[in-house]
């Protein structure tokens, strides 16, 4: 697969394959059978049928295996800034800021109401991209987003209803929850003897939707290895809709959740059937008609700029300071609010990487449980492949793990994990497909032996080279030049007028600038209050207390709130189809225009 890639293909999405399940061309209209069967009709008399334009919904793309991901055009047309504006103008905002509103006691809506509660979640990679673009700190980028989504000078300054977002949360909080649960999952897998509810070793991270879509459609033997945990985006959606629905007495359908992410494939994730209220809601509160998504819409960092432009707003002109208390609405539960909007959320270090630090956290947990142990790092064939071995005080390997970023490296990992080829000859031994690859693996004198894939306990897998700060939806250097011509003087020596296409060196420098903003989130945190460092095990205990409190508050088991499932997507290309059933299936899919259910 990698042999046919070109420079134009090195982005976050792959255009639709030729085996798409929706027709995009119309055949000539058939003449009525009542006419003379012997009549000769000239070709120019045959008029094409006047059919409506073919549309491919995001749900259709997920039901098809002709491609790895959907096209950028499909993604933007279904989940974009236009959908955000249309939704804000279509529904009035439920009033939560009135004097009669009290925490957890005032019911603000009903199933018959047309109002909506608008909430948003923002990825730290988005803030880093904005910070690099406008030459501000990551904290100031947070203020900019809050002012735009919630403040009086942002979205609330226009539109039919003057709507804005009631709460904007940082996905870092739910990322920490996923990190704690990931360490539990890896520990249970190592101690398990093959429980059906646990993934097989090695456990592969599942937070990257591009990687998940690739595995489901091309390598189903990988699915038993995938972590069952939801991503921070999905867990944020489940948290917001379950808590607000319970506390405010509104159905999940009246809570509209927008996620701002660095990646186009996050739109795919939001459209999964497994990530709706049916997966977690109780019998008495779940939707009676159609499932409600945990994340209603996903836009990328670049689309956030487009959203501001569509409303005639300039993001850098917004106040780079916190919103006044009069513009903030208290969260229904004070205990959850103190955790959700806590300023002590852990930031990122260079060692943890740019994609959430899943592997780094697991290594820290196991190192804390084994005093005197040390982590030995060995770089792979490129910077996006790194192997880790936790060595005991007696230099015995305790734990092996790895990081694989980018589809080229992912394919090498998949080949390592591919089951042994069973010979058809009687008495022949099965041959592992990765033996030759292992012989070619370079060895360092002081490093631990390289892993074969199967001996890893955990692997952090991300589709984008360089990780999530390099997501396909991030602001590119050419976009930043147009947005702020003077903000990139140190990155580009050219004048902002008619600037040439960025060179690879300039693109690497730009990505390094985004990474720097991402890693500096802790150093520019608001205020000068210093807190005592919390050990990784103590922080894990705090996270588990929060998760247990959430589960008890909504009266739903944590297993239904935080975990999900995956399924093989089979190709029907070239198979004999039952015409009536196939027609019904296509008609059903065609009715799901706009990514609906």
Curated annotation (Swiss-Prot):
Keywords: 4Fe-4S, Iron, Iron-sulfur, Metal-binding, Oxidoreductase
Keyword Oxidoreductase applies: yes
GO molecular function, one term: metal ion binding
Binding site for [4Fe-4S] cluster 1: 20, 61, 64, 67
InterPro entries: Cytosolic_Fe-S_CAF, Fe_hydrogenase, Fe_hydrogenase_lsu_C
Region (Disordered): 25-46, 424-449
Name listed for the protein in its UniProt record: Cytosolic Fe-S cluster assembly factor nar1
Biological source species: Aspergillus fumigatus (strain ATCC MYA-4609 / CBS 101355 / FGSC A1100 / Af293) (Neosartorya fumigata)
